[in-house]
Amino acid sequence: MWPLVLVPVGLVLHDYLKAPIDRLYFQNPRRPLVGMRNTIIDIITGFSNYRVLDHPGLWLIKFHFRKIQKEFGKVSKKLEKQYFHDLDPWFEKNDNYYFYIAENFPLLKNLIDQIPCINKETALFAVVEGPMTIAPHRAETNLLLRYHLTIEGGGDCTLYTEKGPHVHKEGEEYLFDHARYHELTKTGQGRRVVLILDVHRCF
């Protein structure tokens, strides 16, 4: 009997103890349930290296990189900036960190609509101007992976994950589990623009 009781405890602890530890974890009564699911997904998938080609149609994003880049340069100038600190109070107020929703870019929206593994509701361009750091953090759920395609970047911005560093260089893509540790450091004065997509896992 006792071993059976310890199973859910072990599942929750596996998720809770991932770095960085979320001190507010148990303030949300649903979080331990999500944590058990996260651990089961970790067991099923292992500590995988995620490949774009394993997700149907996702390769089309980088294939159309130049068109996406050109559309961003043209359309973003006409749009109002939306700030991450308004979206989520976890972010400190920073007018140099903002985003544009992907649905305001017709070519990109049409492309995303053709790719079933992409979560259509969260697609956006994230912009960082000047030096900046984003502290270590992780998402609450690992049902989705995160995809980055660097639209603008001179190599002065690095995303650190458990897999090691990924430098945001123009035209390069990266797929990772954002429910595990990641942080960002940008040292230069230039602008970094990344297309961020949440991608459904392929089990």
Task: Annotate each PLM feature.
Residues 2-138, 143-144, 154-157, 187, ...:
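Fe(II)/2-oxoglutarate oxygenase catalytic core
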Residues 148:
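Zn2+-dependent peptidoglycan hydrolase active-site motif and core
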Residues 129-132, 163, 180:
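Short, well-ordered turn and helix-capping elements at secondary-structure junctions
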